[in-house]
Amino acid sequence: MRSGFLQKWRIIMKWQEIPTPCYVVDEKKLKQNLKILQNLEQETGCHVLLAQKAFSMFSLYPLIGQYISGTTASGIFEARLGKEKMGKENHVFAPAYKEKDMEELVQICDHIIFNSFAQYEKYQHYFLQQECTASAGIRVNPECSTQEGHEIYDPCGPGSRLGVVKSEFPDQLPEYRIGI
């Protein structure tokens, strides 16, 4: 089933006639790649999520949504985009959240990842409400760098503030609804 948007704007052109700069998507190749991801989901039971930060061509979300489980966002605006344009699983992670955004995030997201236990505790009252269906998780910093010479950009490097390192984990995890 073709997206209405894609069908409406489907244009056949010679490559040499395409005005530049522009974004051109080869729908056949995209579908081939999406079928690989769909097979991965079927074979493993995992959920493949579109990282909107890497690819936010939302006109293709209906097509992409036919093959994968949903989207992942880095904040309120991407979370809204994923909810509105794909309408499937919607996950969000941000190093920090604003109080005014959390009320909407728990309504439009299925899973919200926090950067620390303190951050989760600040917002846990949203997850304890009976009507809340979103789940929460903690970002783990595995402290396992895979690169050398770029420590400043390494989210797992020494001094990174992204995620909880082993030494910051309590002996016993808190008894509220949270995942890792």
Each PLM stretch: what is its role?
Residues C46-I180:
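Active-site-proximal beta-alpha core segment in soluble small-molecule metabolic enzymes
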Residues I12-V24:
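Generic N-terminal amphipathic, Lys/Arg-enriched alpha-helix
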Residues N33-E43, L81:
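A short, N-terminal amphipathic alpha-helix
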Residues M1-I12:
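Short, Lys/Arg-enriched N-terminal segments with co-localized hydrophobic residues
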Residues P19, T44-G45:
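Eukaryotic alpha-helical scaffold "rod" segments
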